[in-house]
Amino acid sequence: MKDALIVIPAIKKNAAIPDQLIKKLDGITLIQRAINTALNFANNANQILIITDSDEIALIAQRNKIAYKKDQKLSLNSKNIIQVVLSKISEFEQEDIFLYRANTPLIDSDDLKSAYLRFLELNNSILVSVKKERRDVFSIQNGKLDKSIIRNDLCEEIGAFYIFNKSVIENDHYERIPFIIPDNKSIEINNYQDWWICEKILQRKKVVFHVFGDFKIGMGHIFHSLSLAHEITNHEVIFVCNKKYELAVKEIASMDYRVISTENEEKTILDLKPDLIVNDILNTKVNFIKKIKKNGAMVVNFEDLGDGAYHADMVFNELYEKPIKNGNNFYWGHKYISLRNEFDNAKPNLFKESVSEVLIMFGGTDQNNFTLKILKIILSICQTRNIAINIVCGSGYIHKDKILDFISKSLYKKISLHHAIANISGVMERSQIAISSNGRSIYELAQINIPSIIISHHEREFNHDFAKSKRGFINIGMYTERTSAKVEKEFLRLVCDKDYRLNLFKKISKYSFIKNKINIVSSILSLIERSHEIS
């Protein structure tokens, strides 16, 4: 930074809250926060001056080896602050003055640097901190609200800082130029509510979800991480994804989360300096996990059988019922499954004497287009018995045109295609049988009590071992040339044999996963509190 003088006015009598400047905000006094921010911004402590009316604040300045001026009669307001400050700094040689106040504690040294760089671009101007305002204003005509006037070009001054040159102010010929502070940092402490909000924001931790998903891999990891992120409201949540996974980035962005698309995930994550990193990327490597841990973050992995898992703080392998690796940091099986939020209020099915609707669903992408294959297999059975066919496919399903063409040409019209819908549970609640892939959807089917035929997309899915007959599933395995005959046989039996279907229904109805997510998120967030206590 150029040799400017940073002046921190700290007037005790002007405080909105008693002893505001020496009151601890998240463990650090307001004046000390301002000093720390100024020190991070300045080249050295000699560039900082505190002017105050308080003995306590003068002592704090001394302890920080910062110059101060104390005047018990000092009083400042928005109209006189610049002139009063100028009168107190006449002996200082610096021409550029950065008047920085302590009552906006969310503003950091990077914000001050950006503001000063902007100031250096100006001539004959004073830079003023402001925040944007959007106003929807109505006039009243004959006691009624008239047409509103929407204003998006407004801004409001906040008392964070002024930057000016002595000579410009003395000549009294200058313009006031706005420097816009982002909304999330523009809170000015004027009352206890402002204090409470600032403290809550400062206490937030940074949680980074490292995820992937595309046509080949599927979107299960994305939807799983989103369901967890929805439960984390007291901390900052950021998603990091390799830029090649465009489908994943688009899905996350649609949920209004901050998502960083990058070619170098490791560097991006380290630069973010997270308090907690959640990896939902399958098998991790040792070096990657060690680097994150060395950077001070706690690490939680999902569905991880890689060597990096041994070095994580928690590893949830919820899709595997039997432990495959040893370690106290591993958690196995369906009691660690978390369902999407829509299932929180979904109603599990009661047993129905006959089958009126069937569900086909093979994940968000269905790279093998099992959807169309299964539709062709069961169509004649459904048509003969007047069974409605519900097809659910995700936003990444690239065979949509093919299946729409097939449906349009079919003589049977009780076929419904639900593409990228947000309420799959509603379709499930109408269905008595399902045919599905062996991903996370099997737990959703179990939650709604739907006996299901399961076909695995690939070997990794095949190794997921929850979907067994003892839990109400008919697991066909991976698709082979004999799969068509097996599916037709098992589907016909489910439709025709009520006792067989009832037996499977009783088995599957024993399971509920609704409470799991809260417990999992609580366990994950406890790591942050633990790391906070240790530090």
Regions found by a protein language model. Give the residues of each.
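N-terminal nucleotide-binding beta1-loop-alpha1 segment
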Residues: 1-18
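Conserved core of the sugar-phosphate nucleotidyltransferase
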Residues: 78-84, 105-184
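Donor-nucleotide binding loops and adjacent catalytic segments primarily
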Residues: 245, 357-430
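Acidic donor-binding loop of glycosyltransferase active sites
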Residues: 429-440
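Conserved donor-nucleotide binding/catalytic region of nucleotide-linked donor-dependent transferases
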Residues: 480-511, 530
